[in-house]
Amino acid sequence: MTAAREAIRMRAFDAFKADLEAVPPITLRGGDALDSYDEPPPYDAAIDEPTDRYLETFAFNGLNFLDAASWRHYLPRLIDYALRHIASNAPGTMAIDGLLWSLRPPDRDPPRLASLTREQEEAVVAALEQLAFSDDSVYRTDAMQVMEEWWIPGALYRPPC
């Protein structure tokens, strides 16, 4: 990982520190269960350890079903994963596609995108810039679209402040 990406990774973990320390009300595994019309299982520290394999298994389907607090809990881990796998579009990396889709409008009610602090938003933008503008990124087109829709000044679908 480049020094710039490592700095963004650390910035994300710092910005989301409180969210990382909290137990998520809905896990990615729980979100995946909801996607299959099942009841979400309770959090289990051993099963829900956010390893690469866990993210690859549950993020793509599970992210859509997370409330704001649960979503923020996983964002820094997904940013870390995306920066480490920026040049890969292997099947397991659909976790990155899930991350990008979760950063797109429209926002929810209650909001997820608008629930971020300024520091958290800056960490997300820094990660998106890496995904959008790095020569080795296979996510450039999608990341640029996500940025245009919500994350840049004058974004297409972000309500004015």
Predicted regions and their residues:
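Long, low-complexity, highly charged intrinsically disordered regions
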Residues: 1-62
